[in-house]
């Protein structure tokens, strides 16, 4: 009853799901928030001026682009780019430091501040948020630095590779880590 039938001309449909499965994560938050020797989806990561977020996936530049085949990490724009900051000097720029774990988790779990060896990646590309128009993308990519990039996802037994793009379907199984 809280979501309108249409929103800005688009039909909406809310389907109630069983949320119990999200509570069965065999990896406690403390595990995801600690320092890791490889970059894997599901671990804590963030722009040096952000608190913390989750590394979403290991990705590569696409064919036909100058960066084709280049390895990147992918996460939300607000995690890797700090582009939502209202303070202009705090907004992200390419090459900014991405830490692993994220700065808030470094303090909370490791009980210290950010150090040079926390550098995990450098911000490569993002689409800045523009408050004057709808933002259609909440994603950013960064180039890994000292840490090896692992295609695995914490909490998943197998590595799944993207084979294409498809429209979502009601009842379609999706999984998230972190």
Outline where the language-model segments fall.
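Autoinhibitory propeptides
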Residues: 1-31
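Serine endopeptidase catalytic core focused on the charge-relay Asp
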Residues: 29-178
């Amino acid at each position: 009853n809280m979501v309108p039938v249409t929103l800005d001309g688009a039909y909406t449909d809310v389907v109630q799901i069983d949320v119990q499965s999200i509570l069965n994560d065999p990896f406690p938050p403390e595990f995801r928030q600690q320092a890791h020797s490889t970059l894997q989806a599901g671990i804590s990561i963030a722009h040096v001026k952000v608190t913390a977020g989750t590394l979403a996936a290991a990705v590569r530049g696409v064919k036909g682009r100058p960066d084709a085949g280049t390895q990147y990490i992918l996460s939300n724009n607000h995690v890797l780019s700090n582009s939502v900051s209202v303070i202009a000097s705090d907004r992200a720029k390419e090459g900014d430091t991405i830490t692993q774990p994220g700065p808030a988790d470094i303090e909370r779990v490791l009980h210290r501040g950010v150090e040079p060896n926390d550098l995990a990646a450098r911000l490569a590309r993002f689409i800045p948020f523009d408050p004057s128009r709808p933002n259609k993308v909440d994603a950013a990519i960064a180039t890994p630095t000292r840490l090896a990039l692992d295609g695995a996802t914490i909490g998943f037994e197998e590595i799944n590779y993207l084979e294409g793009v498809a429209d979502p379907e009601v009842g379609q199984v999706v999984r998230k880590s972190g």
